[in-house]
A protein has these predicted regions:
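Short, acidic/polar
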Residues: 95-101, 180-190, 242-243
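Conserved short loop/turn motifs at secondary-structure junctions
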Residues: 91, 203-208, 233-238, 262-268, ...
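Metal-associated gating/positioning segment near the N- to mid-region
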Residues: 68-70, 77-131, 251
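Active-site neighborhoods of metal-dependent hydrolases
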Residues: 149-210, 248-252, 256-408
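Divalent metal-dependent hydrolysis catalytic cores, especially in the metallo-beta-lactamase
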Residues: 101-122, 133-144, 192-207, 225-234, ...
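Active-site microenvironment of metallo-dependent hydrolases
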Residues: 5-6, 12-15, 22-53, 58, ...
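Conserved beta-strand scaffold positions in the cores of enzyme catalytic domains, especially
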Residues: 36, 75-77, 87, 136-138, ...
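Active-site-adjacent beta->alpha loops and helix N-cap segments on the catalytic face
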Residues: 119-124, 209-218, 243
């Protein structure tokens, strides 16, 4: 593990490097940049630089940071506003045009599905193939490979042009044979060689199906490629850490970087115990981290395993009246719940069970990242959860500013630098994201820290956030004065560059 002194020394060195780059820029202000962001409060979570500066951008990169006036073809006035690295969403399930629209208005410049993943990862985000306003990518989806091997399903993601994936096949409920496990291993290797950003494992959706040997194979394969695993752990009774213990043991045994998905929604009232277990494992040399949402309900399919085959009311400590039908916002009773489960098994519900004090406790953990876990959204007529539109404005407005859970710089670190640093274990493309430094990618958010807030709510999920003025992706504005710029697609499909020496 890296010592605290080493980290502090590195941070000081980075700060001096940033100051040097600013000083250097004073001698070359005659250059004309593609874009200059002028007069904003620049906040870089890696160096802790926090000051008024001008940023020069050329060819999608930050090339100068200066207190001097810079010339540019486009000047963005950021006076009175914070200039932050773009927000990196590591856990989203909505690579759609509507999802993209609401994401950029919430400051998201990179949208990833690492929990579920896809297979092959090169096919992820079919709606973005003609161009994307944000960067996007996925892990290698174990669930999709399981479907291919066990059900001959070629559906590589939750949805495609042919519709939604079925939740009724053998892939969700049946143990695999040793031969099938070996076949899955080869597909996982193929997905990683195609550039998948690690391996995503929806373990809780197939609790009775995935054996210890199959799960161990997944971690062993990740170890071959020194790439992360992202796990939705098996869920027990409220607070039961057995599912976490299982994953920690595998992460330590195989030496694999492991992310526990939406820990607050899995740990519930046991969040303190769960985080202490992660701390203990990391003190022994493990590489384990986690993330949470900024909204309190869970969202998933009404036909998910936990709602079909297990005692979900005991597991979540709720009842039918705590469940909301996502497409319309209707609150359910037992009769309506069972009817919708029969008639619309691929549709979603919000189950309201997380308490805010659990979330606040999670956010106080220094390594906690924040993600959306946004459900698929295609049009305004069919509702989804508010995470899609308001996650980051809600986090910065309510938890950072209003409740004071952490300082603004630390809040920005959770949604920019920490995801970028973690994902550098999967792909070198993240080494220049999540920072405001010379040479970094010009993925930037400009917002008003006094007014940023979410308007999206359960039952009214498509209200865009307020307080976010401008968003740049690869140096090109995709949000200007709070409005999306139509027809501008600077986003890239992010994959892992292959390295013949290391297989990555």
């Amino acid at each position: 593990m890296v010592s605290r002194n080493t980290i502090q020394t590195y941070a000081v060195a980075l700060t001096f490097a940033l100051m040097a780059s600013m000083a250097q820029a004073k001698t070359i202000t005659s250059d004309v940049f593609d874009t200059v962001i002028e007069g904003g409060r620049v906040m870089d979570p890696e160096t802790n630089f926090d000051g008024i500066a001008n940023i020069g951008i050329r060819r999608g990169k930050i090339t100068h940071i200066s207190t001097e006036r810079l010339k540019a073809n486009r000047i963005i006035d950021a006076s009175g506003l914070v200039v932050s690295p773009g927000f990196i969403d590591i856990h989203s399930h909505t690579p759609t045009r509507l999802g993209e629209h609401l994401s950029v208005l919430d400051g998201i410049t990179t949208q990833l599905d690492l929990e579920a993943g896809s297979y092959p990862p090169t096919d992820y985000g079919y709606q973005y193939k003609a161009g994307a306003q944000l960067h996007y990518g996925s892990s290698v989806g174990h669930f999709a490979i399981r479907g291919l091997v066990m059900d001959n399903s070629t559906q590589g993601y939750f949805f495609s042009e042919d519709g939604f994936i079925s939740l009724g096949g053998a892939m969700w409920s049946q143990p695999a044979t040793p031969a099938q496990v070996n076949e899955m291993r080869e597909h996982l290797r193929n997905g990683l060689q195609l550039g998948g950003l690690g391996i995503g494992v929806l373990l809780d959706y197939m609790t009775e199906a995935v054996t210890e040997s199959e799960l161990s194979m997944i971690f062993a394969t990740a170890a071959e490629y020194d790439t992360p695993v992202y796990v939705h752990v098996r869920r027990g009774m409220p607070g039961d850490p057995t599912g976490l213990d299982e994953v920690i043991a595998l992460a330590e045994r195989h030496g694999v970087a492991t992310l526990i998905c939406h820990i607050t929604h899995s740990a519930m009232g046991g969040i303190g115990v769960w985080l202490s277990k992660i701390d203990a494992a990391n003190s022994r040399g493990a590489r384990i981290t986690t993330e949470t949402l900024s909204y309190l309900a869970g969202g998933t399919s009404i036909a998910a395993d936990v709602f079909v085959n297990r005692d979900w009311r005991a597991i979540f400590d709720i009842d039918y009246e705590d469940v909301q039908w996502v497409p319309t916002g209707e609150w359910l009773d037992e009769k309506r719940f069972l009817q919708y489960q029969r008639e619309f098994p691929t549709s979603s519900i919000n189950h309201h069970y997380v308490k805010e004090e659990w979330l606040v406790e999670a956010l106080k953990w220094p390594g906690m990242m924040v993600s959306t876990d946004a459900l698929p959204a295609f049009d305004l007529e069919v509702k989804t959860n508010p995470n899609i539109a308001g996650t980051y404005a809600h986090f910065l407005g309510r938890y950072v500013r209003d409740l004071g859970v952490m300082p603004l710089m630390d809040g920005l670190r959770r949604i920019t630098l920490l995801p970028a640093q973690w994902l550098s274990q999967a792909s070198s493309v993240f080494e220049t994201k999540g920072r405001i430094q010379v040479g970094a990618d010009a993925d930037l958010v400009i917002f008003d820290s006094e007014t940023i807030a979410a308007r999206a709510e359960y039952g009214d999920p498509y209200q865009p956030s307020v307080g976010i003025a401008h968003v740049l992706v690869a140096g090109r504005p995709v949000v200007v004065n709070g409005s999306q710029v139509e027809g501008r697609y600077p986003g890239q499909h992010l994959l892992t560059p292959l390295d013949a020496e290391t297989k990555r």
